[in-house]
Design a protein with these regions (language model features):
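Conserved catalytic core of nucleotide polymerization and phosphodiester-bond processing enzymes
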Residues: 1-193
Length: 193
């Protein structure tokens, strides 16, 4: 995405993650140390060169607003069942019947601006969990899962290679998954590298 947008990786990552979490231009300005005009130019350049990111975000948000859920890559539902007033302000998101009682009927689904993030994080979790099951079926048991990392005790480098292969092919995608495998006496020692 950074190459497509014509900006450095750190900036592209900040914009991407910021969009997924609903970061506004003011927050982006302070994160990147830019003034308002520089931020506007950067945002325009990013969206002109990488329009699919904003389109995907808007599509996910619309679906969450209209249907109340999204399905992850493996079909799990990410629900948006809480409601809040349409009027701008700080309001507690509530189940529909409570929200109607508290705020009236002019409501919208809460947190839908985070729909793309929920879709990506949920799909990543699906793939990691499926890889754990696939590995278990081959007799390789993970001890710990941290986000998209698995910690396993193995007997040989061949096992590490097999773990890498299973994780890369647990879900076949158009864009290949790349997995790093590291071997060490403990997870702590590997993380120090």
């Amino acid at each position: 995405v950074a190459d497509m947008a014509g900006i450095d990786r750190r900036t592209a990552k900040t914009i991407n993650l910021g969009m997924m979490y609903g970061m506004g231009k003011g927050k982006l300005s302070s994160e990147l140390g830019l003034d308002r005009d520089e931020t506007e130019d950067l945002f325009a350049k990013f969206h002109a060169n990488v329009p699919f990111v904003k389109q995907l975000m808007e599509q996910a948000t619309r679906k969450a607003e209209n249907v109340g859920f999204l399905r992850t890559l493996l079909g799990r539902k990410c629900r948006f069942d809480l409601w809040e007033p349409r009027a701008f302000g700080i309001h507690k998101a509530l189940p529909l019947w409570e929200a109607e009682k508290e705020y009236g009927r002019d409501l919208k689904r809460a947190w839908t601006y985070k729909a793309l993030n929920r879709l990506i994080q949920g799909s990543s979790a699906d793939m990691t969990k499926k890889a754990m099951v696939d590995l278990y079926e081959e007799g390789i048991i993970s001890h710990i899962q941290v986000h998209d990392e698995l910690n396993c005790s193995i007997e040989s480098k061949e096992h590490a290679t097999r773990i890498k292969e299973v994780m890369e092919h647990t879900v076949e995608l158009k864009v290949p998954l790349k997995v790093d495998a590291e071997i060490g006496p403990s997870w702590g020692e590997i993380k120090k590298k």
